[in-house]
Amino acid sequence: MTQGLFIMCPGQGGQHAGMFDLARTDPGAAALLDKSGIILDEATLFDNALAQPSIVAAALAVWEALRAHVPAPMLAAGYSIGEIAAWSVAGALAPLDAIALGRVRAAAMDDAARQGPQQALAAISGVAIDTAAALAPRHGFEIAIVNGYDACIAGGLASGLAALGDALAAEGGKLQRLPVAVASHTSLMAPARAAFDVALNALPFATPACPVLGGVSALALRSKGQAVDELSRQLVQTICWSDCMDAAVEAGITVALELGPGSALARMMQARHPQIACRSVADFRSIDGIATWVARQE
């Protein structure tokens, strides 16, 4: 049986109108999606209010369908909003509570964004992290997520995008605006913390069956206090996803599975740690196909 299973829960970017289809082939997962009350609307899939809870729901519905057919994970982690889903995968949060928390998080972040000028999130590639971190503040941006040696996400005011893009191009880098209207994981999200923290503290947390890697700290966390602190801080602090991948490998994982939607996390893991067997559920046509692949790994 496969040992060292690492479950990865994605953030925004890979959502699509059919992202519940695979999970709906399982009665239990279909029931969870029905109870969530989420109706996917292609026109608003990238709006926070729908995107965040639906991404949590998609990941947890697939996990509901899959978990009886794969070994218990040794570790879980989530990218941005995916960190909420990861705590549910670990057994600490009930799935419907996690989805509801995703709704609160989205609303709080949208409220924070409305308090000032238009915000933006953008992918930076082709320059070292140190270079990106030096250039971003000159144009009103902060590093939101570190994905690799020369890949990160930056958040800030939309008015500074063009100038930041020019500065990066002069250094051989590239800037691509993302379909996210809030500057996630930057100080601009500070007004979102109060409402989110109230909802977060009110939720019942069970003892997780496996640790969850904190997105900010890349530490293996197990308690409600640690979860509350990390989930709150990640609204306004940099997500160190590259460190999370490294920490998972150092912990001894042998197989990594992204729950989807999308396959961005699987691609990043494959690029950074090619020795790890890694796939996304988005690569498969059936729950049985996923379970069979996991079982074949050693």
Predicted features along the sequence, with ranges:
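Residue-level signal for well-ordered alpha-helical positions
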Residues: 135, 167, 268-272, 293
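FabD-like malonyl-/acyl-CoA
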Residues: 1-131, 255-289
